Amino acid sequence: HYPSTITSNDLDLLHKDYRQYLGNICHSIPFFISLGNHEGENDYYLNQNPPNNLAIWGTYWRKYYYPNPSPNSFYSGNTDYEPYGIGNPENYYAWTWGDALFVVLDVYRYQNINSDKPQNWDWSLGIKQYTWLRNTLENSTAKYKFVFAHHIRGQGRGAITNAKLFEWGGFEADGKTYSFDKNR
């Protein structure tokens, strides 16, 4: 993404392009989005020249073409409403089906910004999403629990390697220094 040059029309066209591929499978199976870096709905874009920015347009067009669940009698999730026509961002949610709990997280929308682009401890689920996740897991009686996230945190691949770092596991980049209490 080029946040300073992308337009609402660009994002509309991008989502329309996905439809040809998703249409081949979504007529017979459900489709749930776990938001990631390519949707552009990152917190550090939200406040850049609103309402004309990548995050707001990305959220608007994603919701228009591919709405995610929002809280009701079946789904739980984010109950916030955001300005600029976004409304409920439909960015994290959960549901139980049979004896399985499905939880979808957003590791991009909430950061503790200390730089132009979040690094390490800047990436966060945010306290509201974290509290919701904790309550959802603790209160579930489902035998099976599945948690989905695009990346384990807002940046970086390598799940098992990164799982113990920063907000998720509490360790610094060296993998030896525990500092969750200091940073959270």
Spans of features found by a protein language model:
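Metal-dependent phosphoester/phosphodiester hydrolase catalytic core
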Residues: 1-184
